[in-house]
Amino acid sequence: MAAFRFKRFAVEHDGVAMKVGTDGVLLGAWADCSTAKRVLDIGTGTGVIALMIAQRSDAERVVGIDIDAAAAECAAANFAASPWSDTLEAVQISAQEFTGEKFDLILSNPPYFVDSLLCPDSQRTTARHTTELTFEQLDKAVCRLMSSNGKFALILPTEQMERYI
């Protein structure tokens, strides 16, 4: 599959469960990153959201984490090929286990299927279903990792947003 091309960068997405999609691109374009110096993308996948934020902001550090090894490797390769490679970092780890600094902006296009048929592909199940990251676990991670004046931006379908709030 061909790379997804933006004006200043491209995103390779072969070998990952979730390809570049509308939800991630919308979140990357919509999130207010005007004052963020440290940014965390939970469930980075290909790294598209982190890349868009690195392009749009003056952030000193943008970290993308993903529990899936193939996704973290893909994001790392996309980060290395970008003009912001010195700002971006990909880490293979779950949101529940990730520790360290506090972030001014945390973003997530989380898995949101709760009560639906699981995919036969375990990578796709992890990327799409809340089996590895529930909304409660996401909340706890955000509260633990966000700076006192930080912001949290996420994108969910309407029916899941009602459940999330």
Task: Give the ranges of each region predicted by the language model.
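Class I SAM-dependent transferase core
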Residues: 1-34
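Residues that recognize and position ribonucleotide moieties
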Residues: 4, 106, 154
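Conserved Class I SAM-dependent methyltransferase catalytic core
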Residues: 11, 16, 20, 133-165
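Conserved donor sugar-nucleotide recognition element shared by glycan-biosynthetic enzymes
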Residues: 20, 24, 46, 71, ...
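Conserved SAM/SAH cofactor-binding pocket of Class I
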Residues: 26-108, 114-119
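Short, amphipathic alpha-helical segments
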Residues: 69, 104, 129-132, 136, ...
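Hydrophobic alpha-helix-in-membranes signature
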Residues: 109-110, 156
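Mobile active-site "lid"/loop adjacent to the S-adenosyl-L-methionine
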Residues: 110-137, 141-145
